[in-house]
From Swiss-Prot:
Role played: Component of the 90S pre-ribosome involved in the maturation of rRNAs. Required for early cleavages of the pre-RNAs in the 40S ribosomal subunit maturation pathway.
Protein's name in the database: rRNA biogenesis protein RRP36
GO CC entries: 90S preribosome; nucleolus
Any one of the GO BP annotations: maturation of SSU-rRNA from tricistronic rRNA transcript (SSU-rRNA, 5.8S rRNA, LSU-rRNA)
Region annotation Disordered: where it falls in the sequence: 1-172
Chief place of localization: nucleus
InterPro entries per the UniProt record, alphabetical: RRP36
Organism, as annotated: Zygosaccharomyces rouxii (strain ATCC 2623 / CBS 732 / NBRC 1130 / NCYC 568 / NRRL Y-229)
Entry annotated with the keyword Repeat: no
Pfam families: RRP36
Subcellular location: Nucleus, Nucleolus
Lineage of producing organism: Eukaryota, Fungi, Dikarya, Ascomycota, Saccharomycotina
Acidic residues biased stretches: 84-95
Quaternary structure and partners: Associates with 90S and pre-40S pre-ribosomal particles.
Biased composition (Basic and acidic residues): 22-31, 51-66, 73-83
Length: 299
């Protein structure tokens, strides 16, 4: 008895249902026969043919992997171009609205790629770039002229005292030639002091301008004081050297350390009593501080 006749059950099934069941059974039998035949064929194959098939499969897999790597390494634009070429026959069949949408999205993607390229970090060894719209400054840098750190290259400088014009300049000669400028500086100081003392005038002026006048007054006073102190030191040293070189054939010149001591001695002798007391007190405190430091180290 076959499988079909064993599983027949009494019921109210139509003839069409019975026909469908028969077709299913026949299909199953055919599939079982095909599987058995394929198993028999594999059993008959030799080991050499199986090895050849295995090597062929491995080669195909390696080729697929290389293609995938190449596709990944390619730039995004090239991949898009190739994909567009492959999908060209399919896009021809699509409507015009679809093509317009794709163009719109392509434009957006190209813009994004352009922005990403701009944002990329430049190499530090790349040449410097500058816009052509930027104006060239009127004050140019002279190559080979090295200014000291204290001097600001942006400030205006008198060409008569510029290093690029010639050899080294003697400060004493310049001071002797342009000593009359001290009178103008003194007049400026007096004018600024009169402006600051006048309350009516300062109330009318803005606070920023008043602050700038105060700063300028302070700087001019300090500049004038330093110039006068330098002149005094030069005169003291000059007088001392003249007295020493009266009878001597060889000229005698003081060292820097000796000059400093001579100037300090002269200033101390020409001080008032109160000023001397202040100087002595300051020196005493300084000496005590040094002694305390020495005691701490010895501990």
């Amino acid at each position: 008895m076959s499988y079909y006749f064993k599983n027949i059950k009494p019921g109210v099934e139509s003839e069409s249902d019975e026909g469908e069941d028969l077709e299913r059974l026949l299909r199953r039998n055919n599939q079982d026969d095909a599987d058995e035949s394929s198993d028999d064929e594999l059993r008959t194959l030799s080991f050499g043919s199986l090895k050849k098939a295995d090597t062929m499969m491995k080669k195909e897999e390696d080729g697929d992997r290389k293609l995938n790597r190449k596709i990944k390494d390619k730039p995004s634009k090239q991949v898009k171009y190739e994909s567009e070429q492959e999908s060209a026959p399919e896009q021809e069949s699509e409507s015009e609205s679809g093509s317009s949408d794709s163009e719109f999205f392509e434009e957006e993607s190209s813009k994004k790629n352009g922005d990403q390229k701009k944002k990329k970090k430049r190499s530090k060894h790349a040449p410097a770039e500058q816009s052509a719209k930027k104006r060239v400054s009127k004050v140019r840098e002279i190559p080979g002229l090295h200014l000291s750190k204290s001097q600001n290259p942006n400030l205006y400088q008198d060409i008569r005292f510029d290093k690029s014009t010639g050899g080294p300049t003697d400060s004493s000669v310049i001071r002797r030639r342009y000593g009359f400028l001290d009178e103008y500086r003194q007049k400026e100081i007096e004018e600024m002091e009169s402006i600051l003392h006048d309350r009516k005038l300062t109330s009318k002026l803005p606070p920023e301008e008043v602050e700038s006048i105060e700063r300028r007054l302070k700087s001019t006073k300090s500049r004038l004081q330093t110039m006068k102190s330098k002149d005094l030191e030069q005169n003291i040293v000059k007088d001392y050297e003249q007295t020493m070189n009266k009878d001597n054939k060889n000229k005698f010149h003081l060292k820097r350390s000796e000059r400093r001591k001579l100037v300090q001695k002269w200033k101390f002798e020409h001080m008032k009593s109160k000023q001397r007391e202040k100087v002595m007190e300051r020196k005493r405190k300084k000496r005590l501080g040094k002694e305390f430091k020495q005691f701490e180290f010895n501990k």
